[in-house]
Amino acid sequence: MRTQGKRAVSAAALLLATAGAVVAGGGPASATAADCSNGANGFVTVSDNASGAVARHIEPYPEFIINLEYGTIGGVQRGFARLRGRTVQGDKVWMDWTRDAGRTWIQCGPFTVSYLFAPKTSAAQRTSRDANWRFRACGRGSGANESFCTTWW
């Protein structure tokens, strides 16, 4: 029994050390909305009324819908984040973009909802067949402490 206890403690220590290394290695590099709009860093501005095919979807609160969508914009297939539903002024949406399968990423935004029930989109970035080039959509309700993100696509 004593040996099993030591193994369990050793396994737990290894798991914690490994998890800590993974968390310590990744993270976002923030970019403001200006860093992701009007052609900056390859991003293009998208109308807040734009919609595309839904690649990922979460609804953390009833009718608070965060989508990762894609569509042809200016002749190029691009991905973007979209917040819709029962939005209020101050709700935020952004898109995370990675070129290394999620080890590090750029947070493009946040973009802020300006009035009640208004949809809001992030800027859009071209898609790629490269498996390391991924997006996820994220959002946070006005005054909330917790953010929600889709899985990577």
Q: In which residue ranges do the predicted regions lie?
A:
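N-terminal prepro-regions of secreted/extracellular proteins
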Residues: 1-51
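Post-signal peptide N-terminal regions of Sec-secreted extracellular proteins
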Residues: 30-153
